[in-house]
Amino acid sequence: MSGFENLNTDFYQTSYSIDDQSQQSYDYGGSGGPYSKQYAGYDYSQQGRFVPPDMMQPQQPYTGQIYQPTQAYTPASPQPFYGNNFEDEPPLLEELGINFDHIWQKTLTVLHPLKVADGSIMNETDLAGPMVFCLAFGATLLLAGKIQFGYVYGISAIGCLGMFCLLNLMSMTGVSFGCVASVLGYCLLPMILLSSFAVIFSLQGMVGIILTAGIIGWCSFSASKIFISALAMEGQQLLVAYPCALLYGVFALISVF
């Protein structure tokens, strides 16, 4: 115990006072504190109010004019999807490839075998007229009591395919399948007249045979003339007319019997 008391006496100096230490350590506002000289001029009443540097500049006088940007944004006008004007668009029939003027010219070319055919018009792929003529041919057969729509379309497809292969072998320029179908379909028009006669009287006599032969020659001559004009096959009309006569002969047999 005597040693412990000596240790405590040595640890604390005789001149040490706790009151003096606390006064020296926490006396920040006094003149003797370590922070009194550094923060003596700081005003604590301004604490919490921050002023940006831009606000310290003097304000510009108001001139009465609203601020206007130098370059205004002008949105681009939307482009119409269907063009500038609907009146400039082609008609719907023309977009579908149906031209009544060309249909009429081709029909007149078939009805007048001696008329010179326009190769530029005949080389077009126009299936509107041939479809109408095929339906008319089947309708006249129906009036005669013959339901032969399947035979008409089947023979037409086989005949167009055969003529397509033959003309591509004979011509130098070549021909499309649509052009062949268009020409053969238009030249079916005289065959409609033959089937119409079959509604009125029988074609199994001598008059019917002569009329049938004339109609076959008419159809084959018109088709061969158009093919020669469209494909520039001068001097080969008889070679083209022969397979055409075979095709239209089958249609004539359907009309007669």
Swiss-Prot record:
Induction: By TGFB1. GO terms for biological process: endoplasmic reticulum to Golgi vesicle-mediated transport; insulin processing; protein transport; regulation of ER to Golgi vesicle-mediated transport; vesicle fusion with Golgi apparatus. Residues 146, 195-196 are lumenal. InterPro entries: Yip1/4-like, Yip1_dom. Residues 1-124, 168-173, 218-236 are cytoplasmic. The chain crosses the membrane at residues 125-145, 147-167, 174-194, 197-217, 237-257. Keywords: Cytoplasmic vesicle, Diabetes mellitus, Disease variant, Endoplasmic reticulum, Epilepsy, ER-Golgi transport, Golgi apparatus, Membrane, Protein transport, Transmembrane, Transmembrane helix, Transport. Ubiquitously expressed with abundant expression in pancreatic tissue, islets, beta cells, and brain. Highly expressed in coronary smooth muscles. It holds the Pfam family Yip1. The keyword Cytoplasm does not apply. It is a multi-pass membrane protein. Residues 75-106 are annotated as: Interaction with Sec23. One of its GO terms (cellular component) is trans-Golgi network. Belongs to the YIP1 family. Interacts with the COPII coat components Sec23 (SEC23A and/or SEC23B) and Sec24 (SEC24A and/or SEC24B). Interacts with YIF1A. May interact with RAB1A. Interacts with YIPF3 and YIPF4. It is linked to Microcephaly, epilepsy, and diabetes syndrome 2: An autosomal recessive disorder characterized by neonatal or early-onset diabetes, severe microcephaly, and epilepsy. This is Protein YIPF5. It comes from Homo sapiens (Human). The gene is YIPF5.
